[in-house]
Amino acid sequence: MLILRKDSKFDRKSIEELKELAEVLYNPVKTIVQIRKADPKYQIGSGLVERIAENIKEENIEIVIVGNILTPSQKYNLAKKFKVEVIDKIELVLRIFYKHARTKEAQLQVRLAELQYELPRAREKVRLAKMGEQPGFGGYGDYEVEKYYQKVKREIATIKRKLEKLREHRRVARKGRAKFDTVGLIGYTNAGKTSLLNALTGENKESKNQVFTTLTTTTRAIKGIKRKILVTDTVGFIDDLPPFMIEAFLSTIEESADSDLILIVVDASDDIEEIKRKLKVNHEILSKINCKAPIITVFNKVDKITKEKKRKILEELDRYIVNPIFVSAKYDINMDLLKEMIIEHLNLSIGTIETDNPRLISYLYENTEIIEDILEDNKHIITFRAKERDVNRILKLHKSAV
């Protein structure tokens, strides 16, 4: 059963988003939305609590998911009334994270997020558990309050140290890729980032219609371009996540953001106000991690919208859009045009060199895109494309530049 409390009818919290999240792990059979101010004891109204308790008995509900953030006492009180496990939105997201955390780093990041969620609640959870077992509070009663709090703090410190070491490995790996142009994909879950990655690279990475299919970074080379351009996809954003959860995954987000070019991927079929809000969040997160790379705004799923919707997006959201392009990764619409835009915004320049130096020729073939290679009088006249700074450096170093 899914329950969502909204402050007013204008509250943008979405039961559809909660349902989409829940369906990753469970089979929701009932959804309830209540509009009212938060109740300090239950989060939702006490009258509704009584009615839900009856429904749970009648319909054999096994778990209740509340789409708001519960205090430990609210969770305890609801579990006591419902006699089944109760979790809130953050706990649901953490469980989804665990499902998709396949690497050591992803598992550590999920555990860190879980512990940072747990820390301010630790003392209260232990205190409540000692009052009597309720679903979801098992085991906490075995701890002394302060000892459990300190245990959580120590584990957080240990995980942060481990993640920093892994982060350093990432920096080394990024240096190894420095000779290639890099493109990072940023966006909300289900905007179609993974589908876009597949379309750009010709790969067939898992692309389920579920949130958080991608938790770790994935890097592939763009197909159909002579120059080697690497694209990185990473964890998608979701609404109302507290800062500590975003922070736990910053290292994977940074992997995309530390690129020569950023593609902000947006679901063009969303409502215009929703697109606006998500674009603002994307730019805020890029600003938070001090990303200075140029941006292309990729409106995916153009096959699902009308020309009029496209016009409205461009007119009404002009201040939030940088270098827009409308594509469909699924149906290969405008994907070649997107590749051209990527090359254009990577600030690639063209240079020409006349040389018979085999080491230089080998270097050019390995590190630049060769446009033309003409052999004349035992010398190669090579026209190549690379980052502007690299072209200038190569031409400067080579006295035979023409």
UniProtKB/Swiss-Prot annotation:
Pfam families reported in the protein's UniProt record: GTP-bdg_M, GTP-bdg_N, MMR_HSR1
Residue positions binding GTP: 187-194, 212-216, 233-236, 300-303, 328-330
Taxonomic path: Archaea, Methanobacteriati, Methanobacteriota, Methanomada group, Methanococci
Record protein name field: GTPase HflX
Similarity comment text for this entry: Belongs to the TRAFAC class OBG-HflX-like GTPase superfamily. HflX GTPase family.
Gene giving rise to this polypeptide: hflX
Cofactor: Mg(2+)
NCBIfam families tied to this protein: GTP_HflX, small_GTP
Gene Ontology, cellular component aspect: cytoplasm
Cellular localization per UniProt: Cytoplasm
